[in-house]
């Protein structure tokens, strides 16, 4: 246990928190071709590959994912939530943070109902997370 005098001379250092979605913390100046230190809640990108992958051990499924090149020229893997999607190569998508626990290396989610991504059809509950409009009637 340090004395108060020792703490006055050399204070405690706080731990540096590591970001869980680092690609959202980088901007890009296309005029100067240099990366900038600008954080954003979402980022736009272009899908370079759309496919399925299998989850880690106790689970079994075919999870839909897209490889996305962001506007800051970083390429990341993002999960496509919901049942069915209309994404293909060269689709423009909006990305948010949020990992998928049983898919290694997937730290981002694609926002449904934004840009080229359509909302989930015939969804009645939890619609806002899947970009679905309120049903008529």
UniProtKB/Swiss-Prot annotation:
PROSITE patterns (alphabetical): RIBOSOMAL_S12 (PS00055)
This protein's record includes keyword Ribosomal protein: yes
NCBIfam families, per the entry: rpsL_bact (TIGR00981)
In-chain residues carrying the UniProt-annotated modification 3-methylthioaspartic acid: 102
Keywords: Methylation, Ribonucleoprotein, Ribosomal protein, RNA-binding, rRNA-binding, tRNA-binding
Pfam families, A to Z: Ribosom_S12_S23 (PF00164)
A single cellular component GO annotation: small ribosomal subunit
Tree of life domain: Bacteria
Residue span of region Disordered: 1-57
Function statement: With S4 and S5 plays an important role in translational accuracy. Interacts with and stabilizes bases of the 16S rRNA that are involved in tRNA selection in the A site and with the mRNA backbone. Located at the interface of the 30S and 50S subunits, it traverses the body of the 30S subunit contacting proteins on the other side and probably holding the rRNA structure together. The combined cluster of proteins S8, S12 and S17 appears to hold together the shoulder and platform of the 30S subunit.
Coiled-coil regions listed in the entry: none
Subunit structure: Part of the 30S ribosomal subunit. Contacts proteins S8 and S17. May interact with IF1 in the 30S initiation complex.
GO BP terms in the entry: translation
Family label: Belongs to the universal ribosomal protein uS12 family.
Organism: Streptococcus suis (strain 05ZYH33)
Protein's UniProt keywords contain tRNA-binding: yes
Compositional bias ranges of the Basic residues kind: 9-20
Protein name per UniProt: Small ribosomal subunit protein uS12
GO molecular function annotation: rRNA binding; structural constituent of ribosome; tRNA binding
């Amino acid at each position: 246990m340090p004395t108060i005098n020792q703490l006055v001379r050399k204070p405690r250092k706080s731990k540096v928190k590591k970001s869980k979605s680092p690609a959202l913390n980088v901007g890009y100046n296309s005029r100067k071709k240099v990366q900038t230190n600008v954080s954003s809640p979402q980022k736009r990108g272009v899908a370079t590959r759309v496919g399925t992958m299998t989850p880690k051990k106790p689970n079994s499924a075919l999870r839909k994912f897209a490889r996305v090149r962001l506007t800051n020229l970083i390429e990341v893997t993002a999960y496509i939530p919901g049942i069915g999607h209309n994404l293909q190569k060269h689709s423009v998508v909006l990305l948010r943070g949020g990992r998928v626990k049983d898919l290694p290396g997937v730290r981002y989610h694609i926002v449904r109902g934004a840009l080229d991504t359509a909302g989930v059809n015939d969804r009645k509950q939890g619609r806002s997370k899947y970009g679905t409009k309120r049903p008529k009637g």
